[in-house]
Regions:
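Generic N-terminal amphipathic, Lys/Arg-enriched alpha-helix
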Residues: 1-13, 245
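Metal-dependent phosphohydrolase cores
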Residues: 14, 206
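Glycine-rich beta-strand-to-loop/alpha-helix junction loops that act as flexible
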Residues: 199-203
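Alpha/beta enzyme core
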Residues: 1-4, 19-45, 50-69, 78-195, ...
Length: 245
């Protein structure tokens, strides 16, 4: 899915799902637009939905009953080492191991193990270098830019996609945000070659920056905050309108 996107100079959207309604909305929209899509599941959302097995079963049943024909991946977002194994067992098609908060050597060791496990089972895997700014499931990243040399080392493990910090942030971007570091992204692209790169924190990034990031190798863009805000706004308006529930 992502190799095709990189070759075609476009990016596939990952939209996080937090319940049945979100899952249905994402699947139906992807089908309507005839677009491949990645369903992202954080460990917090997985816990809320009573476990990764429940999520995998719900997605499969909904995919089949809705007659979805576009490519769909079920992907663990910002997974821990333990969470990756749980999702492998639950039937996810793709996992992300976020070891960016570990010392690099520990990140490398755990990534190496999980790449081997994922590929033995025919799953794709995303790894991260350089923590993404903001908070994700209680883990706070400072938003530093990744080291291109470290990115190459992780990419050479055979990961299917690489998330690298380039000044991007989870959640709302502050007014004084300096923007994406395209110099860093270009250097990472030069080091990793055909490796599809991932841009986390897609909400609020201007369209021109998105387009430039895609031109420099980004093939997957994650969106969650924008959906959270839209969902909250629509719910608030519905209740304030005094409609019967």
């Amino acid at each position: 899915m992502l190799e095709k996107a990189k070759a075609g100079k476009y990016a596939v959207g990952q939209f996080n799902i937090n319940n049945l309604e979100w899952t249905k909305a994402v699947l139906l929209t992807a089908q309507e637009l005839q677009s491949p899509v990645i369903l992202g599941v954080s460990e917090g959302a997985g816990k809320y939905m009573t476990g990764f097995e429940t999520v995998a079963a719900m997605v499969k049943a909904m995919h089949d009953s809705l007659g979805i024909t576009v490519p769909v991946a079920l992907h663990l977002d910002h997974g821990t080492y333990e969470g990756c194994y749980k999702c492998v067992k639950a039937g996810f098609t793709s996992i992300m191991f976020d070891g960016s908060h570990y010392p690099f050597e520990e990140n490398l060791a755990k990534s190496t193990e999980l790449v081997n496990v994922a590929h033995q089972l025919g799953l794709s895997i995303e790894c991260e270098v350089g923590s993404i700014g903001g908070e994700e499931d209680g883990v706070i990243g400072m938003g530093e830019c990744a080291d291109p040399e470290e990115c190459k080392i992780i990419a050479d493990l055979g990961v299917d996609m690489l998330a690298a910090g380039i000044g991007n942030i989870h959640g709302k971007y502050p007014a004084n945000w300096k923007g994406l570091s395209f110099e860093t992204l270009d250097a990472i692209q030069q080091k990793t070659g055909t490796m599809p790169l991932v841009l986390h924190g897609g909400t609020g990034i201007p369209a021109d920056m998105i387009k430039k990031a895609i031109s420099l190798g980004v093939s997957k863009i994650n969106v969650n905050t924008e959906c959270q805000l839209s969902f909250a706004d629509a719910t608030r308006k519905y209740i304030e309108a005094g409609k019967d529930l």
